[in-house]
Amino acid sequence: MSEQQQQGAEQALDLNNEMQARREKLAALRKEGIAFPNDFRRDTTSDKLHSLYDGKSKEELEALNVEVSVAGRMMTRRIMGKASFVTLQDMGGRIQLYVARDDLKDDVYSEQFKKWDLGDIIGARGTLFRTQTGELSIHCHSIHLLTKALRPLPDKFHGLSDQETRYRQRYLDLIANESSRETFRTRSKILAAIRNFMVNKGFMEVETPMMQVIPGGASARPFITHHNALDIDMYLRIAPELYLKRLVVGGFERVFEINRNFRNEGVSPRHNPEFTMMELYMAYADYKDLIVLTEELFRTISQDVLGSSVVQYGDQTFDFGKPFIKMSMKEAICHYRPDIASADLDDMDKACKIAESLGIKIEKSWGLGRVQCEIFDETAESQLIQPTFITEYPAEVSPLARRNDDNPFITDRFEFFIGGREIGNGFSELNDAEDQAERFQDQVKAKDAGDDEAMFYDEDYVTALEHGLPPTAGLGVGIDRMMMLFTNSHTIRDVILFPAMRPQK
């Protein structure tokens, strides 16, 4: 047995012994009929106490004589004979408890409290005071065991240094790591701020189907399921776009949805097969209006949630108080690869040679627009560190976007990038039903040629367009990638509570 295996065996034995001792304590509680009480009520949380009383002196607290009831997990305990100090952790943070034998009834201190374990859920009532070292604390006059923890806190044995354990057992990560708790508190605040921003702009929040007969709205491989009662295959949605635009046809001229999308694709630091998107659609607007709205959205969220328009991400600094950089796709390619001539990108043979020199494998179904897009992905995308709008996407890779009036090869579309990754996508919507039908046919041909990410033909959506879609602009924002930026997280798993993981054997 190696030294590492020996250490692992010893840790497992220690854990088993610890759990056995805790189970015996629980058995005693069951025998007394007080194993899992549910009659304790708290009236405040640690963060509220710190907010209200951190500025109060010892004398002021004594004069106020504030009685409180708190509950949470016992994280640390220092027993000093007839008195102990406990660190209690709740959703808002931590507060210190002072527990003295003479302040409790019926020998609770010796017979109960001293036998409790770290990780147990407890409730306490007492008076606020400040210790000799100046720490805000609660002088307890009653304390109760609410839930017996059978497993020890994660850091007692092997800790949570293993990233996979943090993702698989997020509850342990949240118990042990304040940084993780803060990340998800920030995520919640950002979602609330986004909704507030959208409502203030006159948008109505809606919900559209998560299971669809025809998946649409994006080029991606869908998950397939089966509806037993209807006896039909259905798809988990890859995007809500076509349903949201049906609502615009119906007269809801400003709509948005924040919800999950599902794409049967790989997992990476940037990709999770189940992810959160916000999509919005606004009638009587174009992609240029979306650019202004996007800049305002990021500026507002940054200012309202983080308190500044300047965001630090790794060693990069983003100032959302400034306009984003703007350039076309071809301009970006030539900017980051000056050796590539813009004119060559408009020639299929020359563009294919450029792509092949970059290691791009050309598929038979690709046209010039797809080749250009692949060249952009290879040469420019990772270089777009500062907030940047890339415009003039080819129609071939934009089957739902309106063609440009001056150049029908391209569309009135942008994607925006921050930190070298795509964050969102917006365009003036295609509202020509006949053009949309033709583009769906092109997608069907691409699918027949082997492109399993090509779109399906959605006949009902074409019918909806035939009833008249007002001039409309639509935007999609990757919420998880947005969260990565605003929480300085460098993998998408750090901002998704329960990311996709391969099952353990």
Curated annotation (Swiss-Prot):
Reaction(s) catalysed by this chain, per the record, are: tRNA(Lys) + L-lysine + ATP = L-lysyl-tRNA(Lys) + AMP + diphosphate
Q: Which residues bind Mg(2+) 1?
A: E415, E422
Domain of life per record: Bacteria
**Coiled-coil zones:** none
The record's Pfam families line, in alphabetical order, gives:
tRNA-synt_2, tRNA_anti-codon
Q: Does the keyword Repeat apply?
A: no
Which keywords annotate this record?
A: Aminoacyl-tRNA synthetase, ATP-binding, Cytoplasm, Ligase, Magnesium, Metal-binding, Nucleotide-binding, Protein biosynthesis
Cofactor binding, per record: Binds 3 Mg(2+) ions per subunit.
- The record lists Mg(2+) 2 as bound by E422
The UniProt entry, under InterPro entries, shows: Aa-tRNA-synt_II, aa-tRNA-synth_II, aa-tRNA-synth_II/BPL/LPL, Lys-tRNA-ligase_II, Lys-tRNA-ligase_II_bac/euk, Lys-tRNA-ligase_II_N, Lys-tRNA-synth_II_C, NA-bd_OB-fold
Listed GO CC annotations: cytosol
**Is Nucleotide-binding set as a keyword in this record?**
yes
Write out the annotated subcellular location. Answer: Cytoplasm
Q: What is its EC number?
A: 6.1.1.6
According to the UniProt entry, its GO molecular function terms are:
ATP binding; lysine-tRNA ligase activity; magnesium ion binding; tRNA binding
The cofactors named for this UniProt entry are: Mg(2+)
Q: Which GO terms describe its biological process?
A: lysyl-tRNA aminoacylation
NCBIfam families, per the entry: lysS_bact, PRK00484.1
Q: What's the subunit arrangement here?
A: Homodimer.
* Family to which this protein belongs: Belongs to the class-II aminoacyl-tRNA synthetase family.
Write down what this protein is called. Answer: Lysine--tRNA ligase
Q: Which organism is it from?
A: Edwardsiella ictaluri (strain 93-146)
**Encoded by which gene?**
lysS
